[in-house]
Amino acid sequence: MGRTIENKQKIVTEIKSLLDDSEMAVVLDYKGLTIKEMSDLRSRLQTNNGICKVTKNSLMRKAIDGNSNWTDLESLLTGTNAFVLIKEDVGGAVKAIQSFQKETKKSETKGALFEGRLLSESEIKEIASLPSREVLMAKIAGALNGVATKIAISINEVPSGIARSLKQHSEKSES
């Protein structure tokens, strides 16, 4: 028994909603993966605000139709595809995909779309090498704290410098 038109429309609506919330889409060839392996991939992605969706290419085509951010995904819609839609931690999710692929040696990345642009395999790897959002925020906070500390030291140094100069001047005057 095939899917009804209402069921297909519901799936397309769900995919559109997921795409609206996503920053990046990674297309994987999932041929040869077991249900257990797909579940493992999904659980890894869940911790990084990613979702793995397996759907027909024709339904994905309908979901991206008219959405300029995702139209380039069309070129990847051949064969057996799993669509990884990533909301926030793009680097963490791509790392999760790559570690999964390294362990299973069954799945292959067909391509990815980020900010309306198709990414090459090397660009996808570069994204995975980026530090997580938390690490970047900690580095920025540390840098800002360092600047604030230097400013405070500089501000305190001005009166101290004036005081030292006056003291030296008064000592010279006394001698």
Swiss-Prot record:
GO MF terms, alphabetically ordered: large ribosomal subunit rRNA binding
The entry's keywords: Ribonucleoprotein, Ribosomal protein, RNA-binding, rRNA-binding
Subunit structure: Part of the ribosomal stalk of the 50S ribosomal subunit. The N-terminus interacts with L11 and the large rRNA to form the base of the stalk. The C-terminus forms an elongated spine to which L12 dimers bind in a sequential fashion forming a multimeric L10(L12)X complex.
Purpose: Forms part of the ribosomal stalk, playing a central role in the interaction of the ribosome with GTP-bound translation factors.
NCBIfam families: PRK00099.1-1 (NF000955)
PANTHER family: 39S RIBOSOMAL PROTEIN L10, MITOCHONDRIAL (PTHR11560)
Name used for this protein in its record: Large ribosomal subunit protein uL10
Organism: Prochlorococcus marinus subsp. pastoris (strain CCMP1986 / NIES-2087 / MED4)
